[in-house]
């Protein structure tokens, strides 16, 4: 957080010269800094000798992180995504065997096809889902040891745990957050929400503290937080089950009394 007004602070964080100096200051204070380029190195560090899956690892990267895990010596490497495998991915896995599972991480049946793996990576997914906690619950179902989560974020503000839900905001507010978030015009960010494109929409702008709270609720303990201006990478270990409420028979019976029969 900063003593500067939030719009000014976010504007400064988008300035290359200021951000370079600020990251130098962060490093001197012992903060661990992240970047998109560090992700394959984290994968190699944690996947060596382990089973690995990249959840949402097809769009824009053609399964590259799964191949990085295989190169690092993962015992098994796989990609899980809702989109079909790309031609580039299919070409590369002729030489390097990589499993592919097509499905939605929030679908409980996906865990039956993926199984429980040691290391799970999920990058660039969380803010594209209307229910990010359900994404983390799905990741917890398949994660046996370590989760590497990278997501777009906004800088911390005076209200820890804050987040902004983007769809259906008034246009002026959308433009305001677009300016402060440091992102180019995206669907539902500076533009109208389009339900027909589903997960291509940007649903959330979350602070890192919000993401960490969600992780802990889902049964993870954050061990490392690699900081960036408008992104965050978390390395978290499994410490317990995710909070999931399943109504028992008594609850269902009591609830049903409040509703008239459907005709």
Predicted regions and their residues:
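A short SAM/SAH-binding and catalytic strip from SAM-dependent methyltransferases
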Residues: 118-132
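N-terminal, positively charged/glycine-rich alpha-helical extensions of SAM-dependent methyltransferases
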Residues: 1-23
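Conserved class I S-adenosyl-L-methionine
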Residues: 49-61
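Conserved alpha-helix/loop element of class I SAM-dependent methyltransferases that forms part
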Residues: 29-50, 68
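A short acidic, Gly/Pro-enriched loop at the edge of an enzyme's catalytic core
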Residues: 110-120
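S-adenosyl-L-methionine-dependent methyltransferase catalytic module, highlighting the catalytic core
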Residues: 130-262
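Residues at the starts of beta-strands that form the adenosine-phosphate
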Residues: 51, 75-76, 146
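Class I SAM-dependent methyltransferase SAM/SAH-binding core
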Residues: 60-108
């Amino acid at each position: 957080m900063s003593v500067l007004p939030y719009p000014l602070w976010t504007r400064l964080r988008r300035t290359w010269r200021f951000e370079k100096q600020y990251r130098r200051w962060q490093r001197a204070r012992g903060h661990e800094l992240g970047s998109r380029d560090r992700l394959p190195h984290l994968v190699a560090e944690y996947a060596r000798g382990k089973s690995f899956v990249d959840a949402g690892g097809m769009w824009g990267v053609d399964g590259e992180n799964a191949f990085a895990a295989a190169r690092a010596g993962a015992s098994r490497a796989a990609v899980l995504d809702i989109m079909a495998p790309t031609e580039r991915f299919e070409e590369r896995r002729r030489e390097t065997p990589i499993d592919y599972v097509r499905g939605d991480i929030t679908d409980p049946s996906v865990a039956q096809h993926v199984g429980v793996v040691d290391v799970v990576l999920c990058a660039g997914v969380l803010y594209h889902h209307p229910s990010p906690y359900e994404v983390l619950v799905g990741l917890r179902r398949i994660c046996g040891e370590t989760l590497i989560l990278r997501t777009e974020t906004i800088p911390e503000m005076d209200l820890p745990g804050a987040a902004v839900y983007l769809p259906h905001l008034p246009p002026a507010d959308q433009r305001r957050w677009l300016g402060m978030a440091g992102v180019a015009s995206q669907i539902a960010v500076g533009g109208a929400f389009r339900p027909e494109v589903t997960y291509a929409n940007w649903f959330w702008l979350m602070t890192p503290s919000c993401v960490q709270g969600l992780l802990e609720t889902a049964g993870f303990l954050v061990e490392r937080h690699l900081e960036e201006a408008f992104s965050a990478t978390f390395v978290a270990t499994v410490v317990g089950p995710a909070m999931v409420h399943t109504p028992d028979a008594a609850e269902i019976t009591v609830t049903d009394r409040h509703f008239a029969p459907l005709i």
